[in-house]
Amino acid sequence: LLEDGKKQEQLCVKKYQGYANSVQDVQLKNLLMEIAQEEQHHHDMIDQMLQGMTPNMTHSGGATIPQSNNMFESFSGNTNDQILLEDLLSTEKYVSSFYDTVVFESADPKVRQAIQHIQKDEQNHGQKIFNYMNSHGMYDVKY
C-alpha cells in the first residue's frame, strides 16, 4: 500500500504543479504551489518509510496564503479554474479515503502515525480548496 501511496503523491505533485501553471488567479496559483510542496513532502515521507527509515514529518514551511474575507465575492475567473479545482477536490477526497485503509492495515505504529499525519494534511488541502471555491462562487453549499 505504501508504494500505491507514493504513486498517488507523485500524481498529486504533478497535478498541483500543472494546474498552478494553468489557473488565472494569482492567489489560486500560490495556493496550488503551496499544496504541491506539501504533496512532495508526503511523497518523500513515504519514500523514507519504504526505505525502512522513520519519516521526517516536519514541513519545510511553505508560505501561508491569505484567504479572501469576502465570502460573497463573485467568481471572476474562468470556467477552466473551476473544473481544475473540482478535479483537485475529488482527488483529495479519494486520497484521504485511500489513507483510511492504509491506517487500518499498518502494523508499525510509526508508519500509522505518519500516515495519519499525511491524511490530516490531505483533509486540510481539501478544506483549502473548498474554501477558495466557496468564497469565489464555485461551490454552492447546501444546508
Please report, for each region that a protein language model flagged, where it lies by residue.
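A generic hydrophobic-segment detector
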Residues: 97-143
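DHp/HisKA dimerization-phosphoacceptor four-helix bundle of two-component histidine kinases
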Residues: 7, 34-41, 87-90, 117-124
